Amino acid sequence: MLTFSPITESNAALFSQYYGICDYRLSDYSIGIKLMWNDMLASEYAIYAGCLIVRNKVRGRYAFDYPIPVTPDADIDAAFSAMADFCSENFIAFEFSGIPKKYAGEILLRFPNTETRRYRNLGDYLYLASDFADFKGKKYSGQRNHVRKFYAKYPDAIFRAFDEKDTDKLKAFREKVEAAFDKHSYGAKNEMERAWRMLKFVGSPMFRCAGFELNGEIISFCLSEKCGDTLIDHIEKALPEYEGIYPAMVQSFAQMFAWDVTYINREDDAGDSGLRTSKTQYHPVQIEEKYHFRIKNELYYIEKIPLIKTDRLLLNAIEETDIPAYNRLCLDDERNRWWGYDYRQDCAEPDEEYFYADQKKDFGSSTAMNFAVRLDEEMIGEVIL
């Protein structure tokens, strides 16, 4: 059975190595995303059959990433089986999130009874690194013009790598960016705050950090991470008063750091129309779709617990009026020891509605269906499917 442990700053270097060899080309498969959004994703991992298995919280429920082979003898089939067994044994929904399009078929082949969704707002923008380094051709004429204007207006601007010695300058840069920030949506503010959390990693070998400096002050900042053949740009920030600074930063960063990759991933647009326009204008070679899968079982198609009658007994849904009888049943240690489950493992001191609410949750997630067994309309037992 899988045993999961949290992904944290203390073990981040290990996952930087794993994601460094991952060829999925999605930002979801990077230590930067796991750290920036850790309080929301609550990412956990297990190593099984030579594969890195990661699960994250998505809309309040855990969903798996696509497994990553990390040893030469990795067995992805065994990893999938272990994930399925883990969900079955723990009565939780079996879901995947952030699955690359090229592996969507693998999920469907293994689990044909599947609900599939994808979200345009979450698609990552993928560009050729060589396009950004050169800005060649008619399609990049606008970017070239902005870059020329930037250097003509600010000839003393220097693009350079940042390290831990730049902490104070980056703090001053942060204050200026926040003072000029004019977006009021929760999503934009949330992304900004999470971006600043990554400043502590400037100088870390896990990331590539650089930006423009002018007259001793930092005026732009970019933080990226190499994952396989792709450079994933986690953060791009600049002071807006410097005309042309964004295309100049994009090009300079590619020239400095994209020498060993084929692609640059600038992540999603989160549905922001301004970001969508901007990222589209840089001519992505692909918008990498991400798929969410929920593996269905027979219970998925049952909307209501059915009524079953025998000559003597009646089986139907457990009702709120059954709570006293149901609690007596669930708290009967002498009987319950025979089926190997101790509720104290999940809740040491359950309140009056704990067991009733728990079985409703299991049915709602299609993991179990609990029947009350009734004799003369009185609940005398339980059957679980």
Go through each PLM region and give its residues.
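Conserved donor-binding loop and adjoining core beta-sheet/short helix segment
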Residues: 17, 28-102, 213-242, 385
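Conserved active-site alpha-helix within GNAT-family acetyltransferase domains
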Residues: 103-116, 145, 270-287
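Acyltransferase donor/substrate-recognition loop-hinge adjacent to the catalytic core
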Residues: 111-183
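Aromatic (often tryptophan-rich) hydrophobic motifs at membrane interfaces
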Residues: 207-294
